[in-house]
């Protein structure tokens, strides 16, 4: 008899057993009255284990059916040629399938109080975590570290990917091949919904913990104990609790000092008080200062300082940091305290190393009588110990720029600049050298006759040019020179011409008047420049000579105060006198504020 292939395939399909979670749940519900410890997941896992052996046994029992199925699906010609044999094989296959159904029912018939032991619970391929019906997070739970193969709970989201032959019932290392995965075990993504029942062992749940979570309701967390003391913790514990209030800081510890407490007490140990006599500080010192020096004072009482050096016997500070005191060159240092007095201006300052002698090749000279008068006056002042401050010696200076420059002396007051209200010369023009050269302010304000002088030099742009009022002008005999300077003019370029003119008239014994608006700045710089060129002096020496004067030959002009710009011009003029390659102006541009001249 010939049987079509389609009918054969229908026969096999109708008799092939189907396995699903619904059938598994029905089997589990029928057996739940007899066995309280079994559940749907255990039945499923036990079925997977028995199914493996069942497939192997069915393969041994009916190899003909498998080969027949393969032959019938791959070769249609053989199926039509052996129609009689197909009927016999179909009957044999139906018997084999009936056998499989009977073995399946027997395998799921679990006796009461009996737990399947074919596979350890730690090697389940799929496991339903406890109490996760409302679990929506994908965070993996805590892994179990127990080594018990029969009763140790296994953390959810652990799947065994090891080969089947290594899944031994009594494996000592359960977590060797486990991988911690993040699974979303929501009800909509799983085929089973029955939760695992609570363990019926003697250990009771430790308690319910309620934590604030971002959700609207507080979810109780059940901690289920087991035989080994390991717990399941609900995954809601992993959620960040909402902060309802700012935690308050504990009260600060009291810092009040008191007697030291006993060793066994829990209070903070406090150091004993140190008396003021040991600390050597006044009662008005702050507490912070007392605490900062307490340890230093304790070390100081036990350390003997080294012996003080001879020069620091009277010092109150550290003997190692006291420099030796300099002795005066006059030998007046007797260990007495040195009284420091402010530097007095005008007549109390001494001016040394000034000479009226000029080099032999110099084009300028003075009369021998004048030099003798300077020397005699100097000797008279030294013998009488007078208060005159100008001392002239016969030492010729090698350079006019060998003094230290102090900028504070030359800072001019603002009221002395461009001010006509100041009268620096109430008694008329000042004699600045041998009654031949005179310094004065604006002659138009002083009501003096300029025709009494042979040379009149006006260096102020504010003063009127009185050349028309100057009578009988003769070159090199009677002249009026007008140079309109301001307080910021570059006067160094004109000083050579002016000083040469002054020296020419001075050598011939003619009277010279030098003036500006006030007679204390621009005209004073002309006189200082003449001193520098005539006597080969530096800026400081020439300035001090004009300011302090000499009782007989030079009147003291203590009101002079040229500004800094004019002082720099005088320094520039001094560099040109000495033929210096680097000018003072260039030096000041690249030098610190304090310089040595």
Swiss-Prot record:
A GO molecular function held by the record: protein tyrosine/threonine phosphatase activity
Record EC number: 3.1.3.48
Domain Tyrosine-protein phosphatase as annotated: residue spans: 428-579
Composition bias, Low complexity: 55-81, 136-151
Keyword vocabulary terms for this entry: Hydrolase, Protein phosphatase
Keyword Hydrolase: yes
Top-level enzyme category: hydrolase
Compositional bias per record (Polar residues), positions renumbered to this chain: 107-126, 188-206, 216-228
Region (Disordered): 55-89, 107-172, 188-228
SUPFAM superfamilies in the record: (Phosphotyrosine protein) phosphatases II (SSF52799)
InterPro entries: Dual-sp_phosphatase_cat-dom (IPR000340), Prot-tyrosine_phosphatase-like (IPR029021), Tyr_Pase_AS (IPR016130), Tyr_Pase_dom (IPR000387), TYR_PHOSPHATASE_DUAL_dom (IPR020422)
Catalytic residue list: 516 (phosphocysteine intermediate)
GO cellular component terms listed in the entry, alphabetical order: cytosol; nucleus
Catalysed reaction equations from the record: O-phospho-L-tyrosyl-[protein] + H2O = L-tyrosyl-[protein] + phosphate
One protein family per Pfam: DSPc
BP term (GO), one: negative regulation of MAPK cascade
PANTHER family for the chain: DUAL SPECIFICITY PROTEIN PHOSPHATASE, DUAL SPECIFICITY PROTEIN PHOSPHATASE MPK3
Family listed: Belongs to the protein-tyrosine phosphatase family. Non-receptor class dual specificity subfamily.
Protein name, as recorded: Probable tyrosine-protein phosphatase
Species of origin: Candida albicans (strain WO-1)
Gene that encodes it: CPP1
